[in-house]
């Protein structure tokens, strides 16, 4: 059996960070939304016993058992007693270690594909398995935009209208940010100044005034070049611009698709003119995660009968 799906990237429209807990994690209140861009994940399940294999064309450093997608497949096999060989192929489009949830989304995509292949419908068991793999993975199993609390495992649906975004990812290795470092910098800033951990409050209705990220200030303090990227977005017409997750990707919210497209072109032009090493992505938030579909060959996908059957009903 061969299944394919999109592993969407995400942004955090809101990220509020509470104090560090006894287990070393922080309590969070975050609003995450999936995007219409992401990785293409192709999962093949053999009829024979065998290992899990994971390949990422063009990114050999992401091959192998340490990839979150491969770890998700192994965890699924252990939990549900599966010994079939599983081959995973990921066409990587979401930047890596960017605050966009790419690896977590790939892992969730594999879980969704395997759940369909083996007819696993126990959502609670899948959610628990997802949390073992990573804090963001449960979100990518859910229906769409959601408020997440705790480590990210307590999810409640959120009504977020489609938003047109421009994402700017600095590919310069000196601007890379490990998630653990971002939270440590926030803890250090709070310990050394008047900024106390905020009261997280309860999830509410989304409104633009909520846009914000507690990790942004300490990350910008350590990586001042991020402030220039935020300025590029505002200068190109964004109504607001913030960092996503633990960064270093920043994004701007624009009043429409045309405005976002024009801004993306302008920022790309600026990048060619001197702000080298940035990747500019045009995206829109979506209300649902993508479905898992049977793989179809390019020939069958382009046939008249397939085109008719693939139309929404």
Curated annotation (Swiss-Prot):
Low complexity: compositionally biased ranges: 292-307
EC class of the enzyme, as a word: transferase
Catalytic residue list: 10, 136
Disulfide bonding pattern of the chain: none
EC number: 2.7.1.148
Domain of life the protein comes from: Bacteria
Keyword line: ATP-binding, Isoprene biosynthesis, Kinase, Nucleotide-binding, Transferase
Catalytic activity of the protein: 4-CDP-2-C-methyl-D-erythritol + ATP = 4-CDP-2-C-methyl-D-erythritol 2-phosphate + ADP + H(+)
Pathway: Isoprenoid biosynthesis; isopentenyl diphosphate biosynthesis via DXP pathway; isopentenyl diphosphate from 1-deoxy-D-xylulose 5-phosphate: step 3/6
Residues the entry annotates as binding ATP: 95-105
Ranges for region Disordered: 289-313
GO biological process terms, semicolon-separated: isopentenyl diphosphate biosynthetic process, methylerythritol 4-phosphate pathway; terpenoid biosynthetic process
A Pfam family reported for this protein in Swiss-Prot or TrEMBL: GHMP_kinases_C
MF terms in GO: 4-(cytidine 5'-diphospho)-2-C-methyl-D-erythritol kinase activity; ATP binding
Keyword Nuclease: no
Similarity remark: Belongs to the GHMP kinase family. IspE subfamily.
Function field: Catalyzes the phosphorylation of the position 2 hydroxy group of 4-diphosphocytidyl-2C-methyl-D-erythritol.
Stated name of the protein: 4-diphosphocytidyl-2-C-methyl-D-erythritol kinase
Gene this chain is encoded by: ispE
């Amino acid at each position: 059996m061969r299944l394919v799906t999109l592993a969407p990237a995400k942004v955090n429209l809101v990220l509020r960070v509470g104090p560090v807990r006894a287990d070393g994690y922080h309590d969070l209140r975050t609003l995450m939304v999936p995007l219409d861009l992401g990785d293409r994940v192709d999962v093949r399940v053999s009829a024979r016993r065998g290992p899990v294999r994971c390949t990422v064309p063009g990114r050999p450093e992401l091959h192998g058992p340490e990839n979150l997608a491969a770890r998700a497949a192994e965890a699924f096999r252990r939990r549900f007693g599966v010994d079939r060989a599983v081959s995973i192929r990921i066409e990587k489009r979401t930047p890596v270690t960017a605050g966009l949830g790419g690896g977590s989304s790939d892992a969730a995509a594999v879980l969704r594909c395997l759940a369909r292949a083996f007819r696993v419908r126990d959502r609670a068991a899948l959610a628990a398995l997802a949390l073992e793999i990573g804090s963001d993975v449960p979100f990518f199993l859910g229906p769409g935009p959601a408020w997440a609390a705790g480590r990210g495992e307590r999810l409640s649906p959120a009504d977020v209208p489609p938003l047109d975004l421009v994402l700017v990812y600095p590919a310069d290795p000196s601007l890379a940010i490990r998630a653990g470092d971002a939270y440590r910098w926030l803890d250090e800033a709070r310990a050394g100044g008047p900024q106390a951990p905020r009261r997280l409050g309860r999830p509410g209705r989304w409104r633009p005034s909520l846009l914000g990220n507690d990790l942004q200030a300490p990350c910008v303090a350590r990586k001042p070049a991020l402030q220039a990227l935020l300025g590029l977005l505002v200068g190109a017409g964004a109504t607001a611009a913030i960092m996503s997750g633990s960064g270093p990707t920043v994004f701007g919210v624009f009043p429409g698709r045309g405005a976002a497209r024009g801004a993306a072109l302008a920022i790309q032009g600026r990048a060619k003119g001197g702000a080298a090493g940035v990747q500019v992505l045009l995206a829109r938030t979506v209300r649902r995660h993508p479905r898992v579909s049977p793989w179809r060959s390019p020939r069958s996908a382009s046939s008249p009968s397939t085109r008719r059957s693939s139309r929404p009903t």
